[in-house]
Amino acid sequence: ENFSGGCVAGYMRTPDGRCKPTFYQ
């Protein structure tokens, strides 16, 4: 799933190219 190189709203892209929820910080 590629959203212009980004992720779904509320998610961030990790260095390995995956997406993680920003609230896991």
UniProtKB/Swiss-Prot annotation:
Source species, domain of life = Eukaryota
Point out residues bearing the modification Glutamine amide: 25
Q: Does the keyword Disulfide bond apply?
A: yes
Q: In which tissues is it expressed?
A: Hemolymph.
Q: Which UniProt keywords apply?
A: Amidation, Cytokine, Disulfide bond
Please state what the protein is called: Growth-blocking peptide
GO cellular component terms listed in the entry, alphabetical order: extracellular space
**Which Pfam families does the protein's record reference?**
GBP_PSP
Please explain the role this protein plays, according to its UniProt record. Answer: Biogenic peptide that prevents, in lepidopteran, the onset of metamorphosis from larva to pupa. This growth-blocking peptide has repressive activity against juvenile hormone esterase.
Question: Into which family does the record put it?
Answer: Belongs to the GBP/PSP1/paralytic peptide family.
List membrane-spanning regions.
none
Q: Which GO terms describe its molecular function?
A: cytokine activity
Q: Which InterPro entries match?
A: GBP_PSP (IPR003463)
Give all cystine bridges in this chain.
Answer: 7-19
